[in-house]
Amino acid sequence: MASETVSNHQEKALALLQADAEKILRLIKVQMDHLTMPQCPLYEEVLDTQMFGLSREVDFAVRLGLISEEQGKAMLGELERELSALHEAFTNKQQ
């Protein structure tokens, strides 16, 4: 019974983190679709705040043993790659 509860908590934690990551990914995708300026202070502030918040959530879940460190790194890494692609696309548009 206790292992079922732990497993359930782990699944819920991962699902919640993935949902938060998806929100950030959607924000990135909207920016990619419109190629709005990534240097816009509001844009940077929102994404930085969201990414920082998610990184803290991931760290907390890892420390509780709800997700593995590898899962957390993979989740954040995917978002960082998308951000990098956005900046690259915008830079290419400017040239």
From Swiss-Prot:
Pfam families: DUF1507 (PF07408). InterPro entries: UPF0358 (IPR009983), UPF0358_sf (IPR036270). Belongs to the UPF0358 family. This is UPF0358 protein BCE_3996. The lineage of its organism: Bacteria, Bacillati, Bacillota, Bacilli, Bacillales.
